[in-house]
Amino acid sequence: MAAEEKDPLSFFAAYGSSSSDSDSSDEEKEAEKTKNRATKRPFPTETKKLPGPDELFRSVSRPAFLYNPLNKQIDWESRVKRAPEEPPKEFKVWKTNAVPPPESYQVAEKKAPPPELDMAIKWSNVYQDNGDDAPHANQAKCLPEEEAQEDSPPSDDEQENATKKHKV
């Protein structure tokens, strides 16, 4: 693959140079490079681990902040810094606009229209079509017949006011 790679400047080489001469010189150069790489490796193939703290301080003097005349061993656990513990968080229910599960559905009951309401009566009232053929609602009787007869009929003034309001 490396032999197949050509020098990008070979296009500008002299007219009479042959490609076989350049191939052999490329191979020689690559062989020299690999030899130089092999001899230039200063690192050994085995990697050494870093020494532990106790082993390190045997060969190096201890810093003053670690000196404890009573205890010759270093208490590394007391030197460790830990993050403060956070209290457990309370669970809060999220407020969402998501659709609730089907078990929690409650069918909203709609009120039925009153039984005496009839669309023919409603439209008749809207257009004030109160002719003979106009539908009339059944008058509900709240009072017993005896008490209804005792009530006096409305006076003439009340009837005039009612007709004026109705003729608007």
From Swiss-Prot:
Q: Return the annotated region ranges for Disordered.
A: 1-56, 124-168
Could you tell me where the Basic and acidic residues compositional bias lies? 46-56
InterPro entries for this protein: DUF4660 (IPR029089)
Q: Where is the composition biased (Acidic residues)?
A: 145-160
- Signal peptide positions (record): none
A Pfam family hit? DUF4660
Similarity-based family: Belongs to the UPF0690 family.
Which protein is depicted? UPF0690 protein C1orf52 homolog B
